[in-house]
Amino acid sequence: MSKRLYIVVEGQTEEEFAKDLMAPYFLDHGIYIYPTIIHTSRGHKGGFVNYEHLKNDINRLLKSQGEDVVVTTFVDFFRCPELPGAEDCSRIQNHAERVAKIEKAISDDINDWRLYPYIQLHEFEALLFSGSFLI
């Protein structure tokens, strides 16, 4: 049985990465990937402006799809305004721990077992231009 994975992405770069590199891998495992860029306003997409836009897109996907759907996110950590738990986590020095707590807070806020939030710790575009020997 196949599954569908909707990835709510920040912009065109993440969308292309999901389509061109992730989709073929997941398709081999019976998972169809559908990246969707965050709606920031009526008729506009891209750029992570606020949490409500992200939450609205996630909820729209979860409500309009069946049980065979999983939703995740692909947004940069430094562009995460007003996320649930962000203020409580601001004292955590380890950024990976901070991201994990914020992902958990998003999951708790939306409260649907089909949601697996993912926040990219380092700006995705910066990773594309770094030497692989540095990573």
Language-model segments: residues:
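Short, surface-exposed loop/strand segments
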Residues: 1-69
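Activity-critical C-terminal alpha-helical subdomain
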Residues: 77-135
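Residue-level detector of well-ordered alpha-helical segments, enriched
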Residues: 69-70, 120
